Curated annotation (Swiss-Prot):
This is UPF0246 protein CPS_4102. It comes from the Bacteria. GO terms for cellular component: cytosol. InterPro entries: YaaA. One of its GO terms (biological process) is response to hydroperoxide. Belongs to the UPF0246 family. It comes from Colwellia psychrerythraea (strain 34H / ATCC BAA-681). Pfam families: H2O2_YaaD.
Length: 257
């Protein structure tokens, strides 16, 4: 069973590391091509392209300019400990044991606009480049065209190494569009999280994002290997809702948040 999630805009390169173990991203040559395009952009062009404030555009222009290989523990940080958005609040990798990190390294991947696909312990340098960004590049007008089949090929390699054919999609629509479903050698299970509000179950973005992280944490900490075991997920009051689930779209609901 392979899990995929989105990255986060918010980063944390300051807090103490929960592990000293690390690995290297597998697609850095591709990342370098994107960096070569990004460093040509002025802060104002970055602000327009990424819809950022002048301050954030300046910060990210500096990040692109400072990006350099090789990655070391002095100039980079493990991906799973670098992202700090709602999904990662639910995941809470800072509290992982060595066994949790080991399981995650095999069974958990992070989709990325710049790095393509990251293992949890892959070192990364700070960046902002969302998958939906319309960055012109040598392969097209956006990052979906740039990555093409590359991300899917990497996922297929990982699935083959796991000798498994199930992928749990905990990523956003924007990021999962980078995966070519027809080329993926896996059944895709997509969990959805809904909260009771105004007399009906609804997807509430903040809660749904955190729940994706909670589910990843549940799978990792319990070392789940069978997809049916996911239906036992019960963190934060969520429960599998068989009546609302259909085929490979699994719905988890809760009445109180």
């Amino acid at each position: 069973m392979l899990l995929v999630v989105s990255p986060a805009k918010k980063l944390d390169f300051e807090s103490p590391l929960a592990t000293e173990k690390f690995s290297q991203p597998g697609l850095l040559e591709q990342s370098q091509l994107l960096i070569d395009d990004c460093i040509k952009l002025s802060p104002s062009e970055i602000a327009s392209l990424m819809k950022l404030s002048d301050k954030l555009a300046g910060l990210n222009a500096a990040r692109f300019g400072q990006w350099s290989t090789p990655f070391t523990q002095d100039n980079a940080r493990q991906a799973i400990l670098s992202f700090n958005g709602d999904v990662y609040t639910g995941l809470d990798a800072q509290s992982f044991s060595d066994e949790d990190f080991e399981f995650a390294q095999k069974n958990f991947r992070i989709l990325s606009g710049l790095y393509g696909l990251l293992k949890p312990l892959d070192l990364m340098q700070a960046y902002r480049l969302e998958m939906g960004c319309k960055l012109g590049n040598s392969r097209g007008d956006n990052l979906y065209q740039f990555w093409g089949e590359i991300i899917t090929d990497e996922l297929n390699k990982t699935l083959s190494e796991l000798d498994d054919d199930v992928l749990i999609n905990l990523a956003s629509t924007e990021y999962f569009k980078s995966v070519k479903k027809k080329s993926l050698n896996a059944t895709i299970i997509t969990p959805t999280f809904k909260d009771w509000k105004n007399g009906q179950y609804k997807i509430i973005s903040f809660f749904a994002k955190k729940a994706r992280g909670l589910m990843a944490r549940y799978i990792i900490q319990n070392k789940l290997t069978s997809v049916e075991q996911i239906k036992t997920f019960d963190l934060a009051g969520y429960q599998y809702n068989e009546a609302m689930s259909k085929d490979n779209d699994w719905v988890f609901t809760r009445k109180e948040s």
